[in-house]
From Swiss-Prot:
Family from the record: Belongs to the GTP cyclohydrolase I family.
Designated gene of the protein: folE
Protein name as it appears in the record: GTP cyclohydrolase 1
One Pfam family cited in the UniProt record for this chain: GTP_cyclohydroI
Positions of Zn(2+) binding: 93, 96, 166
Subunit structure comment from the entry: Toroid-shaped homodecamer, composed of two pentamers of five dimers.
Pathway this chain belongs to: Cofactor biosynthesis; 7,8-dihydroneopterin triphosphate biosynthesis; 7,8-dihydroneopterin triphosphate from GTP: step 1/1
InterPro entries attached to this UniProt entry: GTP-CH-I_C/QueF, GTP-CH-I_N, GTP_CycHdrlase_I, GTP_CycHdrlase_I_CS, GTP_CycHdrlase_I_dom
Gene Ontology BP, a term: tetrahydrofolate biosynthetic process
Protein's organism: Mycobacterium leprae (strain TN)
GO CC terms of this entry: cytoplasm
Keywords from the named record: GTP-binding, Hydrolase, Metal-binding, Nucleotide-binding, One-carbon metabolism, Zinc
Reaction catalysed by this enzyme: GTP + H2O = 7,8-dihydroneopterin 3'-triphosphate + formate + H(+)
Domain of life of the native organism: Bacteria
Entry EC no(s): 3.5.4.16
Length: 205
């Protein structure tokens, strides 16, 4: 089933599949004009191309199918908790197009078939959703729902901790403030003991 059908992808804007380098360069050039700069001066002459290439990388998650990331399964008959902690994460706030960064902690209880996915695939899934214009709450839920969709686990728990530079560099200007979001699915939502065990392991330093 497609992730659009599961509500894991936004339908508000048609998803483009090819990055438009030329259009991005023109937009950055116009932005430089708008702030009163000369995009043709020595220090800025190549900036539109550089920023466009950076955007292609920073937003590469828009052009990757999440279904292809969790494509490696192992029949390990494992039925206990799997946790990957402290996954470094860099994303871009969709409100100001400024970075937010931190760590993601991913835990899941394999389904009845005992199948698990590769640990690197979990990190790649975090990267895929982080490399989009995002809000932290949606990012957290998208990771959880993608794992549910692909792995059919008994439970999923996600905790994301991040500093938002839109709070540190501008506006309220509170550097060091950390936002924590979580998403729980399945057994972790219905069983308080399972949820407490997972959170204890995730938050233990």
């Amino acid at each position: 089933m497609a992730l659009l059908d599961l509500g894991l992808e936004s339908t508000a804007v048609p998803r483009i599949r090819v990055f438009d380098q030329q259009r991005a360069e023109a937009a950055i050039r116009e932005l430089l004009y708008a702030i009163g700069e000369d995009p043709d001066r020595e220090g800025l002459a190549d900036t539109p191309a550089r920023v466009a290439r950076a955007c292609r990388e920073l937003f590469s998650g828009l052009y990757t199918d999440p279904q292809t990331v969790l494509n490696t399964m192992f029949d390990e008959e494992h039925n206990e908790l799997v946790i990957v902690k402290e996954i470094p994460m860099y994303s871009t706030c969709e409100h100001h197009l400024v970075s937010f960064h931190g760590v993601a902690h991913i835990g899941y209880l394999p389904g009845a078939d005992g199948r698990v996915t590769g640990l690197s695939k979990i990190a790649r899934l975090v990267d895929l959703y982080a490399k989009r214009p995002q809000v932290q709450e949606r990012l957290t839920s998208q990771i959880a729902d993608a794992l549910v969709s692909k792995l059919d686990p008994r439970g999923v728990i996600i905790v994301v901790e991040a500093e938002h530079l839109c709070m540190a560099m501008r506006g309220v200007r509170k550097p060091g403030a950390i936002t924590t979001t979580s998403a729980v699915r399945g057994q972790f939502k219905t069983d308080a003991a399972s949820r407490a065990e997972a959170l204890g392991l995730i938050l233990r330093k």
